[in-house]
């Protein structure tokens, strides 16, 4: 797994939050300090999250990158070492 995959999973999680009504594009934009149109484009895949934006949204939502790693992926990584 690479950072692009983790970023893809983070964006998918944010899309799910918006679809379920637990967050709004505007609210996510405020958390990261970007405009709502910019956040919209990030969620639609037209723009990518910068590292700073990803860090901010993770911190504000009390998430960690490990929240986006499946247990089986961790076990596979341990086996390869």
Description of each model-found segment:
Residues 34-37, 51, 63:
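Short linear motifs centered on Gly/Pro in flexible linkers and helix caps
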Residues 46-59:
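Short, basic-rich loop-to-helix N-cap that marks the start of a DNA-contacting helix
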Residues 1, 59, 69-81:
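Short, charged recognition helix plus adjacent turn
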Residues 35, 46, 72-75:
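The DNA-recognition helices of helix-turn-helix-type DNA-binding domains
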Residues 20-41:
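Short alpha-helical DNA-recognition segment
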Residues 1-23:
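A short, Lys/Arg-rich alpha-helix, primarily the initiator
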Residues 15, 26, 30, 55:
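Residues within the helices of the helix-turn-helix
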């Amino acid at each position: 797994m690479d950072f692009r995959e983790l970023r893809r999973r983070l964006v998918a999680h944010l899309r799910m939050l918006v679809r379920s009504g637990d967050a709004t594009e505007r609210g996510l934009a405020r958390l990261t300090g970007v405009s709502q149109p910019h956040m919209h484009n990030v969620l639609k895949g037209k723009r990518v999250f910068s590292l700073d934006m990803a860090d901010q949204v993770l911190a504000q939502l009390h998430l960690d990158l490990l929240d986006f790693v499946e247990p089986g992926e961790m076990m596979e990584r341990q086996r390869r070492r």
